[in-house]
Amino acid sequence: MLKVKLLQYTPEPEKTIAAAAKLCYSPVGVDDILENLTDEGAEKFLNMLMSYGHMSPIEHVSFTFAVEGVSRSLTHQLVRHRIASYSQQSQRYVKLDQFEYIVPPAIENDEVAKKLFIDQMQGAQKAYDEIVERLKDKYISEGIGEKPAEKKAIEDARYVFPNACETKIVFTMNARSLMNFFHHRCCDRAQWEIRTMAEKMVNEVKKVAPILFKNAGPSCVAGPCPEGKMCCGKLKEMRTLYLGK
């Protein structure tokens, strides 16, 4: 099951952004700015920044997520968002005695497709186990110790695992990169799995920075759809989902 947890974030993110932006136009230092910066003042200034499209100050705050129950297909898409830091469960160092896998809903709901899919997953596990044992025995016979032999075996045996293989990942993005991520991955044209994750992430960041992320979501939430002829035609539904109106 897909789980998203907001592990950490910059304390008082909206005040931090407002203070950083105000510093650009202030003769005093950040201590004086923060001392006189009320919640209402920070909100007003942040709204002004966002309305002007002045985005560089929001790079000062970051958000760290822990995600579980996702496929390697998802993480291959995720790491294309390059202004971020990623730490993913390793198939090289973690032996998968019984690997978990993600079944897409379209396959789950088709009895024949599901059987074909599960047969392939079970076949991959069987092949992995046999390759690990075969290579491990070979390396031991060559004089390599048992533990390093197993490690050497599993790093090659993992090549049989499919994109469906379940994985876990921790990643950090600054707010500007996160906004860009939401524009692309909350879009109806994004694949179902990463879109579901993005929706959960939006819900998490809105709890701690509601002003900053009030228009978070696909590009069409706060402006025109950039997809041209590929537009999904669901602008009204998307704005209802993300803005509640």
UniProtKB/Swiss-Prot annotation:
Complex and partners: Homotetramer.
Domain of life: Bacteria
Positions that bind dUMP: Q77, L78, V79, R80, Q88, Q89, S90, Q91, R92, R158, R185
Residue span(s) of domain ThyX: 2-219
GO-annotated molecular function: flavin adenine dinucleotide binding; NADPH binding; thymidylate synthase (FAD) activity; thymidylate synthase activity
Gene responsible for this protein: thyX
Keywords: FAD, Flavoprotein, Methyltransferase, NADP, Nucleotide biosynthesis, Transferase
Protein name: Flavin-dependent thymidylate synthase
Stated family: Belongs to the thymidylate synthase ThyX family.
Position of sequence motif ThyX motif: 80-90
Pathway, per record: Pyrimidine metabolism; dTTP biosynthesis
Binding site for FAD: S56, R80, H81, R82, Q88, N174, A175, R176, N180
